[in-house]
């Protein structure tokens, strides 16, 4: 009898549950169908699944090639492509100043929230993830002047010391003595350089990757995993609240606890005068400037805000700079004529083999400038749609189509960099000469107009009020180390026919740039 009752109860329960779940699935299907049919974005072309669910984006982002896919979609569908139920990706350089304006009326979306931290149950938004224009301006104002070119130039001695140590370590490991001739994973060493520069300009002390020659504290690996996580949850921000920001149990990437601890300890040591062994007040670093900002803006900057500033420097200041360096070196080496022209341009610097090229000198090298600009065009550090909410009044596209307020629009720097109306029919090819004037074919006036058009279409560092705050520092690092490496060393790819590997997790990381190094002959 008990067995019969148990079977009967189980059957009855299934009879009740099955219709419930059936009704739930039916309701979801109806909801998706109605949402799809009434969406104001339905008329815009794109993959069918992209119009139904953000899972389409998550799938392709996870594969690490979404920038290439998006470019192919624009070639297929045109300048307007629907990439999610409420998101349209635009290949319209003429709208950059509208969507990414200094007014901030096209607000950042929740896409960026995944890079925030959570402390004592409260989500802490940083300069990158803060979407409110007024709050962002309030956070940025106390430190903005320190990131201008005039603000970062006093940091050049810190960068000089790090470049000098990079050269010493490269010579020890790959050029001199019994280790001469070993293949060098130059991309990895340039990453160590950029991370150590961040430590040097922020705390006056390198983190130690160049000295040890590997990711000894796993911070770089953790940073990569954190970016992999961010790239995925940014496509469907609710996932971040269910995982990393879960109020009950955190399910997320490895935390930046070590970076937080480094930042806190350096702040304590500085305030207590315990870092005099490596900190020289006559060579101020960012921590000095943040403490100064606390005194000047006490209502905005407290110790917690200083830690936030320090962490932004640490987390965001190294990867994109290394990506640009890797791209410039890789594309130059893949094109021997380009590398030869760089060597010729720096031949006068080669006579002083111990020199660390000053930024002013490097900046005045026209072909080096062209190579770096072209490398950033071909391989921007960020290569995803930079989302913004359309304001209430909506957006009228150049072709007359209308996108209502509340929808999301954005542009991908990688896609814009292949727009043939700006860059020409050879937009898919690395050609530094496009940044230079050919006196036999172009007047100065025509060149300046073309240069203006190219600059206006460049979204490498963002634009408007949310332009990358670390742009000047990053470019100083890139110009100085590129000029120094080219002037000092003969560099060739270990496999000239091989290709690097890239993975797009918002930042487009590279690997597989192995080279042979030797000193330049006199």
Residue ranges: model-predicted function:
Residues 411-448:
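Conserved cytochrome P450 K-helix/beta-meander segment immediately N-terminal to the heme-binding cysteine loop
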